Amino acid sequence: MNSAALNARTASVAPQPQACHACKCRQLLSRRVPPAQRQVECSAIAPETLQDIIVGGAVVGAVSVALYAGLKKDPVPCSLCQGTGGIRCFACGGDGRNATVSRDDLYDSKALGGGVAPPKRDPLGRTINPRDCKVCRGAGLVLCSQCKGTGFQSAF
């Protein structure tokens, strides 16, 4: 082949458009698609643009939260418990212990064998201490139902 024929052959072939990234436009640019349909603009978001959108959204969100937190008022004590977080347990008197515990309550009566019987356990396998007050669970304090023991009213 001479160079004139080679130049004429390459001049008649249009340059192939390049796909921007891995999306559907890559399939449309294949040789199987007729040239009239190959002229397509990709509407997909480039990865760099997507990253800019995510970072920008995170910055705007962080600034919004900081501004909102700065606009909050001073905490107000709970109106129900007057800021104490709860009341002293009425069942144990704030002690957290149950004074009336029998020997049968301490150990499982179904255990066989001599010696000391194993302690009672709840369904999750945790040891139950029968000396703890059942109302306050050994804390000596019943938490306020309005503030959940924080002593302050909800600011939100």
From Swiss-Prot:
Record's keyword terms, sorted: Chaperone, Chloroplast, Metal-binding, Plastid, Repeat, Transit peptide, Zinc
GO molecular-function terms, A-Z: metal ion binding; protein folding chaperone
Keyword presence, Secreted: no
Presequence range in chain numbering: 1-41
Residues at which Zn(2+) 1 binds: 78, 81, 144, 147
Result for mutant: residue 42 to S: Impaired chaperone properties
Effect the entry attributes to changing residue 144 to S: Impaired chaperone properties
GO cellular component: chloroplast stroma; protein folding chaperone complex
Subcellular location: Plastid, Chloroplast stroma
A biological process term (GO) from this entry: chaperone-mediated protein folding
Function: Chloroplast chaperone required for RuBisCo biogenesis and translational regulation of the RuBisCo large subunit (RbcL). Stabilizes an end-state assembly intermediate of eight RbcL subunits until the small subunits (RBCSs) become available to produce a complete stable RuBisCo complex containing eight small and eight large subunits.
Subunit structure: Interacts with the RuBisCo large subunit (RbcL) assembled as an intermediate complex made of eight RbcL and eight BSD2 subunits.
Family stated for the protein in its record: Belongs to the BSD2 chaperone family.
Protein name: Protein BUNDLE SHEATH DEFECTIVE 2, chloroplastic
Originating species: Chlamydomonas reinhardtii
Gene name for this UniProt entry: BSD2
